Amino acid sequence: MGKFEVKKVKTGIKFNLKAGNGEIIATSEVYSSEKSCLNGIESVRKNCVADIEDQTVEGFEKLKNPKFEIYVDKAGEFRFRLKAKNGETIVASEGYKAKASCKKGIESVKKNAPEAAVVNAE
């Protein structure tokens, strides 16, 4: 079972969505308050059923938000981000060497986010 791990950082508070094996699937931005951080978690739960826009394919179809976007970063790695209905990025992934692994990350968000418990980081 996955979990949202809430963590205080120097500039505020953020969360990671972790898979059952403890691996980080996606990371949020830094929020100024715990309330806004928890709202971000609810937004991931609500929007994780979104479709996938694969921006690595030439002539890709632009989808409406909410959506997952797959893209290639400056280092040439595949990444995904989940955008809310308002276009804000809610969570983003680490870099993946293969697009198939990136897609598995998205599937893991879809599987884990709806039922994931919210816990405070140690």
Which role does the model predict for each range below?
Residues 1-10, 46-74, 116-122:
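Intrinsic disorder/low-complexity detector
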Residues 3-31, 40-44, 67-97, 101-109:
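A structural feature that tracks compact, well-ordered secondary-structure segments
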Residues 33-36, 55-59, 98-101:
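Short amphipathic alpha-helical linker/capping segments at the junctions of internal repeats
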